[in-house]
Amino acid sequence: MPQVDPELFDRGQFQAELALKASPIAAFKKAIRQAREVLDTRFRSGREIRRLIEDRAWFIDNILQKAWDQFSWSEDADIALVAVGGYGRGELHPYSDIDLLILLDSADHEIFRDSIERFLTLLWDIGLEVGQSVRSVDECAEQARADLTVITNLMESRTIAGPEHLRQRMLQVTSTEHMWPSKDFFLAKRAEQKARHHKYNDTEYNLEPNVKGSPGGLRDIQTILWVARRQYGTLNLRALAGEGFLVESENALLASSQEFLWKVRYALHMLAGRAEDRLLLDHQRSIATLLGFEGEDAKQSIESFMQQYYRVVMSIAQLSDLIIQHFEEVILAPEDEAPPQPINARFQLHDGYIEAINDNVFKRTPFAMLEIFVLMAQHPEIKGVRADTIRLLREHRHLIDDDFRHDIRNTSLFIELFKCEIGIHRNLRRMNRYGILGRYLPEFGFIVGQMQHDLFHIYTVDAHTLNLIKHLRKMQYTPISEKFPLASKLMGKLPKPELIYLAGLYHDIGKGRHGDHSEIGAVDAEAFCVRHQLPQWDTRLIVWLVQNHLVMSTTAQRKDLSDPQVIHDFAQIVVDQTRLDYLYVLTVADIYATNPTLWNSWRASLLRQLYTETKRALRRGLENPVDREEQIRQTQSAALDILVRNGTDPDEVEQLWSQLGDDYFLRHTAGDVAWHSDAILQQPADGGPLVLIKEITQREFEGGTQIFIYAPDQHDFFAVTVAAMDQLNLNIHDARIITSSSQFTLDTYIVLDNDGESIGNNPQRVEQIRKGLTDALRNPDDYPTIIQRRVPRQLKHFAFAPEVTIHNDAQRPVTVLELSAPDRPGLLARIGKIFLEFDLSLQNAKIATLGERVEDVFFITDAHNQPLSDPQLCSRLQDAIVEQLSVSHEPTIEMTRLSI
């Protein structure tokens, strides 16, 4: 800390200002404001971050000393002002907690009560937000014994004012001789760290990470230092290196990583104007600019900054693992430790952990750098890797070069890992953690820490890839197998499960390079297969899966699965049942690993429907596609059978059906046709809109809520309906619009609530929806007032220009309008209003929300129920949608079309 820094705080000038003023508050506030401005200017000019946070602590020391001196403490008074916690370490960011302990010799606080209260009031009045406690030395001991947080804070302390002997006594009575011996402290801190990591999903790669608390954050470094302080009495990284826990290169890496996070945290506090440790989307762009990250556009600079952030926290996490493992071996070493048990000529088992026989194992036999992970997968009783062996891996990974990558011993070992029954994900994660995976597969190294600036992909590409493999493994076990019953069943029957793991490893490996990542990944996957001498059939399947890993999700979410031609086209891509099984399992795992909160029962239903229909098509033979007329006849026959059994007059049914047209029977099941028909025939002529609601959930975790509306057609029907559903907090995922020859509309919507779940067995909610829709359709003039709702915080940071493409369908007499736009409340209602203004009719819609982006497909016709044929009309329609959905007052970030 500086001894003198008059620019930051001039003691003489401050004392003079205090003497001139009747109240000291103004002088204190002025000094605090000026100091903040000075430090912020120094930060922007590139001043060393360690100096900045130490300078702020020094300044606060001076302010507190001056504030303390405003009160009459006798020179021999047994009371001291002590800095604890981060402030006790001498580290303060702009809005860090200023933790203070007012330390007394005696538990009798009364003699100092008035002065203490007035001192704390002064701190509050001058704008310092402090965390304070008032304790005697004995009370410190009592509370520290019971509370891990208290003992941790007291270990980091400095006397700011008053006698130092009080703090020394406090340290003595809270030492390891009296409480929290090293072993207990380590176990408690390790458990605390695990709980904290779990809170952040056990990953460094959250979309909005916490710079302090997330895995690999500043708290992990502090945990290392706390344990070291308790065990060795040292409290800095260099001292750790002196104890042999860090080599010099590791010490330098940890120190530089800490300083990078300090810069990020300082910038966060400065920009937020408050204590803020979450790297929110609100601040990522500004911090990227502030720290000098550049790119062709804002999105690229953010991604460059975040990739650097993720790689830094990965480095911290790696070293934290190593040091914590080192501590465990030293602090928890049993007194009667059993001798190591040999595993083979290169490795042995030491207290449950694998370690190299000697320091030259990886130098003499480099293939052992892959063998160690295969051994851990083959021997699940192995708890992990000894610290010295982790360090040896890190020190020898430079030996992984092209010769290593083509050595048949290494290629065989790598493939062997994917054939293990358990431990594949765990050991791939270790390989990534220790920097081995990215060295062995340079193309994988490229995606490490690579983020995608959107709400759909909540993990970096490498974390998502390893998550996918984890979910593939877990599909064979409960509870995840219950959520994905078909995928789990198929996973257990795949002839070579290792192939889907390899396809999963490569499915997104082409991201971040210019071009179609599926095509780029397929090229890399083929090169991998050739290098690893996989059979031709295996190679073809892996390459095909990587190349087509998006096809199933795209077809299910963007195309009309009731159209036999859609199923036939997809079946022609798949060709055989084996590919279909592999692709379905990969697709489910991919979507769920991308963002589990965006997986919902309707997506599950669509994928199962596409799988089932394609399976039937493959059994029937690609040369024998379903005939539309035959499908219509089968649906009508089955529906009529249901109705007649229930006592419905078949002549009335035939009369109703004659008004509906072929599309109605292609888009609905026989059960739905019977349900609709029975209700329509019972509806009074003047009964108003008919609104039917039912669950279509056939299996747990699949389905949605179906809303069927039958009413006289009106031009604003769709606009009114979707506006009302928006007001009812319903998310539309599918819409089928039929207009009968008698000018009645038969609309079917599949909806979920805001949690991505169907409405379920909730009569009150069902009645609320029924009444809301009925009232809206009876009073259509009210609908424009109900489409305004506040845009959620995160969505505001993904403003990009809407994309609209319009083309006529080659198979059906409709025009296809594809929309990609920022998700906003009331978006469908706005679209409906535009269709109304352009005198267009909606025939069908596929609605997909992918994070902050909607990917919707609308099948429309003109006022004469014909496809659009006027290019100028199409151009005006495009312009109207783009103008209506553009965010005019927010910066635009150009974004590419999302892929799962």
From Swiss-Prot:
Uridylyltransferase (UTase) activity is inhibited by glutamine, while glutamine activates uridylyl-removing (UR) activity. Keywords: Hydrolase, Magnesium, Multifunctional enzyme, Nucleotidyltransferase, Repeat, Transferase. Modifies, by uridylylation and deuridylylation, the PII regulatory proteins (GlnB and homologs), in response to the nitrogen status of the cell that GlnD senses through the glutamine level. Under low glutamine levels, catalyzes the conversion of the PII proteins and UTP to PII-UMP and PPi, while under higher glutamine levels, GlnD hydrolyzes PII-UMP to PII and UMP (deuridylylation). Thus, controls uridylylation state and activity of the PII proteins, and plays an important role in the regulation of nitrogen assimilation and metabolism. Belongs to the GlnD family. Its cofactor is Mg(2+). The lineage of its organism: Bacteria, Pseudomonadati, Pseudomonadota, Gammaproteobacteria, Pseudomonadales. It comes from Pseudomonas fluorescens (strain ATCC BAA-477 / NRRL B-23932 / Pf-5). The keyword Transferase applies. This is Bifunctional uridylyltransferase/uridylyl-removing enzyme. PROSITE patterns: ACT, HD.
